[in-house]
Amino acid sequence: MAKPASIKIRLNSTADTGFFYVTKKNARTKTEKMVLKKYDPVIRKHVEFKEGKIK
């Protein structure tokens, strides 16, 4: 069987609140680490979320 194109990743908050999102990305076309600006409900602000591994 072929390896799937999309993998699950964890987006960790840069505000160090411990909050994270889980999403998918295409590992073949998006080789760099994903950085998105999303809402962190712990501090109730939009902050950057950086890609990390799912443990």
UniProtKB/Swiss-Prot annotation:
Family label: Belongs to the bacterial ribosomal protein bL33 family.
InterPro entries per the UniProt record, alphabetical: Ribosomal_bL33, Ribosomal_bL33_CS, Ribosomal_bL33_sf, Ribosomal_zn-bd
Xref: SUPFAM superfamilies: Zn-binding ribosomal proteins (SSF57829)
Entry keyword Ribonucleoprotein: yes
UniProt keyword terms in alphabetical order: Ribonucleoprotein, Ribosomal protein
Gene3D superfamilies on file: Ribosomal protein L33
Lineage start: Bacteria, Pseudomonadati, Pseudomonadota, Alphaproteobacteria, Caulobacterales
Organism: Caulobacter sp. (strain K31)
Entry's Gene Ontology BP terms: translation
GO cellular component, one term: cytosolic large ribosomal subunit
Disulphide bridges, residue numbers: none
HAMAP family: Ribosomal_bL33
GO MF annotation: an example: structural constituent of ribosome
Protein's UniProt name: Large ribosomal subunit protein bL33
